């Protein structure tokens, strides 16, 4: 949830999976051509939060079909497991923290973003001093904190939703309703 002590460390852990610089483990799957696309991030609300990881199976042009959802899920879980096991370099942590601080500085230059920041602080009942000291809070997060939250939250407790394109049923037509259509006035 918003304001949870693990929220920022978890944001960094999720950035180790997917980030704008494409240095995450899911980004590597995309760059290596093992999946078509993928992403990871957090959604935080006042009383609960979610970690979302989405991946699109690789489309094989020659066979004109996608790779199986099972193989895509397996590759994705392996990428997540690397982070959960603490298999990441220290420089990535520092780069992600610096990028988060840079984005905060850019956000503080935009009036609309400042308004959104204040609004979020208000409805999540967060201390404004703590919200404005975001950069100090981010830089204080240690690698051990990130390993701890990654191990705690990136585990086997997940729901996998597989979405596939359905096939049209041939020969079935919808019957017309048994009432007269409404005629528009002229």
Question: PLM features: residue spans?
Answer:
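PPIase-associated folding chaperone regions across multiple families
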Residues: 5-12, 30, 142-145
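Proteolytic maturation boundary segments
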Residues: 22, 27, 129-186
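His/Glu-based metal-binding/catalytic segments typifying zinc-dependent metallopeptidases
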Residues: 1-22, 43, 54, 182-186
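M16 family metallopeptidases and their MPP-like homologs
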Residues: 1, 27-139, 160-164, 172-173
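Short beta-alpha junctions and helix-cap segments that line functional grooves
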Residues: 12, 39-40, 148-149
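Generic alpha-helical structural context detector
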Residues: 14-18, 27, 120, 151
């Amino acid at each position: 949830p918003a304001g949870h002590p693990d929220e920022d460390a978890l944001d960094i852990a999720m950035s180790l999976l997917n980030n704008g610089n494409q240095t995450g483990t899911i980004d590597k799957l995309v760059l290596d051509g093992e999946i078509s696309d993928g992403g990871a991030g957090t959604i935080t609300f006042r009383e609960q939060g979610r970690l979302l990881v989405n991946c699109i199976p690789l489309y094989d042009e020659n066979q004109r079909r996608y790779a199986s959802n099972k193989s895509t899920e397996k590759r994705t879980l392996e990428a997540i497991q690397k982070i959960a096991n603490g298999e990441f370099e220290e420089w990535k942590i520092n780069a992600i923290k610096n990028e988060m601080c840079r984005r905060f500085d850019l956000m503080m230059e935009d009036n609309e973003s400042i308004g959104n920041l204040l609004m979020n602080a208000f409805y999540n009942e967060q201390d404004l001093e703590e919200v404005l000291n975001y950069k100090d809070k981010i830089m204080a997060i240690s690698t051990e904190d990130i390993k701890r939250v990654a191990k705690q939250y990136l585990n086997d407790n997940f729901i996998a939703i597989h979405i596939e394109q359905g096939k049209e049923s041939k020969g079935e037509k919808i019957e017309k309703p048994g009432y007269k259509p409404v005629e528009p006035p002229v």
